[in-house]
Amino acid sequence: MLTLIAILAISYLVGAIPTGIMAGKMLKGIDIRQFGSGNAGGTNAFRVLGWKAGLAVTLLDILKGIVAAVSIVAFFRHHPVGAFPDINEVALRLLAGMSAVIGHVFTVFAGFKGGKGVSTAAGMLIGIAPVSMLIVIGIFLLTVYVSRYVSVASILAAIAFPLIIAIRKYIFELGGGLDYYVKLFGERFSFHDSLDYHLMIFGLIVALAILYTHRANIRRLLSGTENRIKFGRHS
């Protein structure tokens, strides 16, 4: 039990690192929550700080999810505080990742007002189901390029994830997932691309959560007032 608490607590603190707010303070001396959409995530960083800072914030937010779902769980598997929790591996990684997402959205370091959790949730899922997430990322990037609406891309990507898991698992009959091996710098690395049913259930919950956290964006889209991103506008 102590190990599970430690995993969730540290994952929350990692997710709570307010990357967007820190970038705004360092680059322009501002709180980006007071500008643009009023959000502390990567999307608003693109609008307020420019594409370079926005990309950096987004990548760091993604990294928080990967660290929680992969590195923190792996660390405590080898260094448990008491007994390691008897929980399905994918379910445990999802719990750790969700703790990081909660930290990102309700960050203790910035008055519990953070981002919307899309990038951190994406990072968590990259760590668990990288191949499925590559497809989702492709959908996200294509939608951003065509529409210039990051909010639309986030919503479509969230809806696509559980569908992709279901299609790969049941239509292509890939079972619980596949193991892949890559060679980098002369070393052989392996990783597992999970298709565990927990991912489908979780994906549906995330899709609903993304729709909820983007309700203001949806209202602006319907009224035609949603902000579009413009690449190259800022340096």
Swiss-Prot record:
Record Pfam families: G3P_acyltransf
Q: Any idea which UniProt keywords this protein has?
A: Cell inner membrane, Cell membrane, Lipid biosynthesis, Lipid metabolism, Membrane, Phospholipid biosynthesis, Phospholipid metabolism, Transferase, Transmembrane, Transmembrane helix
Segments spanning the bilayer are 4-24, 56-76, 94-114, 122-142, 152-172, 191-211
Listed under catalytic activity are: an acyl phosphate + sn-glycerol 3-phosphate = a 1-acyl-sn-glycero-3-phosphate + phosphate
Q: In which pathway does it act?
A: Lipid metabolism; phospholipid metabolism
An annotated GO cellular component:
plasma membrane
Q: Does the keyword Chaperone apply?
A: no
Q: Supply one GO BP term.
A: phospholipid biosynthetic process
Q: Which GO terms describe its molecular function?
A: acyl-phosphate glycerol-3-phosphate acyltransferase activity
UniProt subcellular location? Cell inner membrane
What Enzyme Commission number does this protein have? 2.3.1.275
| InterPro entries recorded | G3P_acylTferase_PlsY
Q: How does it sit in the membrane?
A: Multi-pass membrane protein
Query: Where does it primarily localize?
Result: membrane
Kindly state the subunit structure of this protein: Probably interacts with PlsX.
Task: Say what the protein does.
Answer: Catalyzes the transfer of an acyl group from acyl-phosphate (acyl-PO(4)) to glycerol-3-phosphate (G3P) to form lysophosphatidic acid (LPA). This enzyme utilizes acyl-phosphate as fatty acyl donor, but not acyl-CoA or acyl-ACP.
The record's family statement is: Belongs to the PlsY family.
Can you say what this protein is called? Glycerol-3-phosphate acyltransferase
Give the originating organism.
Answer: Chlorobium phaeobacteroides (strain DSM 266 / SMG 266 / 2430)
Taxonomic classification: Bacteria, Pseudomonadati, Chlorobiota, Chlorobiia, Chlorobiales
Question: Gene behind this chain?
Answer: plsY
